[in-house]
Amino acid sequence: MTEDIEQKKTATEVTPQEPKHIQEEEEQDVDMTGDEEQEEEPDREKIKLLTQATSEDGTSASFQIVEEDHTLGNALRYVIMKNPDVEFCGYSIPHPSENLLNIRIQTYGETTAVDALQKGLKDLMDLCDVVESKFTEKIKSM
């Protein structure tokens, strides 16, 4: 009987391992220097135009962005509102348990809401690039 207990003990012993997320981080090769620009292919399913909330002339539209939250929503709203062709921009999270971001853009007659969204995304990316380069510059000078 003691032999059975000993076998059960050895069968259930687990060797200590690092948590899975730490193992995955070690396997990833991340370049933080910014020396190498990598172009990612755009995800066509990431942003959806909500056709029910879009005007015929395209000056007002609502979009749904998948897998995003307040972090992108507030920054994007701020950058889009800096555009003088934009009359209104607001965002909402429909429900806390859903990872969706709804954004509404209304423009003056010269610009479409799609153009304003594209310009806002580009301007936000440019802003992030400047912040990253300044940060990297300061880190290297330390």
Curated annotation (Swiss-Prot):
<keyword id="KW-0690">Ribosome biogenesis</keyword>
<dbReference type="GO" id="GO:0006363">
    <property type="term" value="P:termination of RNA polymerase I transcription"/>
</dbReference>
<feature type="compositionally biased region" description="Basic and acidic residues">
    <location>
        <begin position="1"/>
        <end position="11"/>
    </location>
</feature>
<keyword id="KW-0804">Transcription</keyword>
<dbReference type="InterPro" id="IPR036603">
    <property type="entry name" value="RBP11-like"/>
</dbReference>
<dbReference type="GO" id="GO:0006383">
    <property type="term" value="P:transcription by RNA polymerase III"/>
</dbReference>
<dbReference type="GO" id="GO:0042790">
    <property type="term" value="P:nucleolar large rRNA transcription by RNA polymerase I"/>
</dbReference>
<dbReference type="GO" id="GO:0005666">
    <property type="term" value="C:RNA polymerase III complex"/>
</dbReference>
<feature type="region of interest" description="Disordered">
    <location>
        <begin position="1"/>
        <end position="45"/>
    </location>
</feature>
<dbReference type="GO" id="GO:0006362">
    <property type="term" value="P:transcription elongation by RNA polymerase I"/>
</dbReference>
<dbReference type="GO" id="GO:0006361">
    <property type="term" value="P:transcription initiation at RNA polymerase I promoter"/>
</dbReference>
<dbReference type="GO" id="GO:0006386">
    <property type="term" value="P:termination of RNA polymerase III transcription"/>
</dbReference>
<keyword id="KW-0832">Ubl conjugation</keyword>
<dbReference type="GO" id="GO:0042254">
    <property type="term" value="P:ribosome biogenesis"/>
</dbReference>
<protein>
    <recommendedName>
        <fullName>DNA-directed RNA polymerases I and III subunit RPAC2</fullName>
    </recommendedName>
</protein>
<feature type="cross-link" description="Glycyl lysine isopeptide (Lys-Gly) (interchain with G-Cter in ubiquitin)">
    <location>
        <position position="134"/>
    </location>
</feature>
<feature type="modified residue" description="Phosphothreonine">
    <location>
        <position position="15"/>
    </location>
</feature>
<dbReference type="InterPro" id="IPR008193">
    <property type="entry name" value="RNA_pol_Rpb11_13-16kDa_CS"/>
</dbReference>
<comment type="similarity">
    <text>Belongs to the archaeal Rpo11/eukaryotic RPB11/RPC19 RNA polymerase subunit family.</text>
</comment>
<keyword id="KW-0597">Phosphoprotein</keyword>
<dbReference type="InterPro" id="IPR033898">
    <property type="entry name" value="RNAP_AC19"/>
</dbReference>
<dbReference type="GO" id="GO:0006384">
    <property type="term" value="P:transcription initiation at RNA polymerase III promoter"/>
</dbReference>
<dbReference type="GO" id="GO:0042797">
    <property type="term" value="P:tRNA transcription by RNA polymerase III"/>
</dbReference>
<feature type="compositionally biased region" description="Acidic residues">
    <location>
        <begin position="24"/>
        <end position="42"/>
    </location>
</feature>
<dbReference type="GO" id="GO:0003677">
    <property type="term" value="F:DNA binding"/>
</dbReference>
<keyword id="KW-0240">DNA-directed RNA polymerase</keyword>
<dbReference type="GO" id="GO:0003899">
    <property type="term" value="F:DNA-directed RNA polymerase activity"/>
</dbReference>
<dbReference type="Pfam" id="PF13656">
    <property type="entry name" value="RNA_pol_L_2"/>
</dbReference>
<comment type="function">
    <text>DNA-dependent RNA polymerases catalyze the transcription of DNA into RNA using the four ribonucleoside triphosphates as substrates. Common core component of RNA polymerases I and III which synthesize ribosomal RNA precursors and small RNAs, such as 5S rRNA and tRNAs, respectively.</text>
</comment>
<feature type="modified residue" description="Phosphothreonine">
    <location>
        <position position="33"/>
    </location>
</feature>
<comment type="subunit">
    <text>Component of the RNA polymerase I (Pol I) and RNA polymerase III (Pol III) complexes. Component of the RNA polymerase I (Pol I) complex consisting of 14 subunits: RPA135, RPA190, RPC40, RPA14, RPB5, RPO26, RPA43, RPB8, RPA12, RPB10, RPC19, RPC10, RPA49 and RPA34. The complex is composed of a horseshoe-shaped core containing ten subunits (RPA135, RPA190, RPB5, RPO26, RPB8, RPB10, RPC10, RPA12, RPC19 and RPC40) where RPA135 and RPA190 form the DNA-binding cleft.</text>
</comment>
<dbReference type="GO" id="GO:0005654">
    <property type="term" value="C:nucleoplasm"/>
</dbReference>
<keyword id="KW-0539">Nucleus</keyword>
<keyword id="KW-1017">Isopeptide bond</keyword>
<dbReference type="InterPro" id="IPR009025">
    <property type="entry name" value="RBP11-like_dimer"/>
</dbReference>
<dbReference type="GO" id="GO:0005634">
    <property type="term" value="C:nucleus"/>
</dbReference>
<dbReference type="GO" id="GO:0005736">
    <property type="term" value="C:RNA polymerase I complex"/>
</dbReference>
<dbReference type="GO" id="GO:0006360">
    <property type="term" value="P:transcription by RNA polymerase I"/>
</dbReference>
<dbReference type="GO" id="GO:0046983">
    <property type="term" value="F:protein dimerization activity"/>
</dbReference>
<dbReference type="InterPro" id="IPR022905">
    <property type="entry name" value="Rpo11-like"/>
</dbReference>
